[in-house]
Amino acid sequence: PILQTLSAFHTALNFMQHGFHWEEHEVLEAIWMNTAQNSIERLCTQCIIHLANANLKHIMKRKTATQKIMKNANALSAEIGRRAPNSVALTEIQKLFLKYAL
């Protein structure tokens, strides 16, 4: 499925905008489990999950965990950029990184 068409995906992004990172993570994990192995949708969802988790760890003042998780998010973003350089997925990830990267 195309992520942007899923109401659950929009719910997760709404949670993110309002600082409900755990809830966002839970919704995205359910989506992630239903994406095709090694697909751009799977990488994109996993990347956003890492952003949510990093923001949660940041709120919890767990600096080392935040840095480690952001490193993983950055690696996934780079992989999306390599595999789908002109994609909507990459554009959306870049927008989220501008708002939520730590």
Regions found by a protein language model. Give the residues of each.
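N-terminal alpha-helical interaction modules that lie
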Residues: 1-36, 74-102
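Start-of-helix signal in alpha-solenoid helical-repeat scaffolds, especially tetratricopeptide repeats
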Residues: 2-5, 40, 45-48
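Structural register within alpha-helical repeat arrays
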Residues: 11, 46, 51-53
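Short alpha-helical basic/polar micro-motif
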Residues: 22, 52, 64
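Amphipathic alpha-helical interface segments used for dimerization/assembly
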Residues: 32, 51-55, 70
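Alpha-helix boundary/capping segments in eukaryotic regulatory proteins
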Residues: 38-44, 58-65
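TPR/TPR-like (Sel1-like) alpha-helical repeat modules
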Residues: 61-81
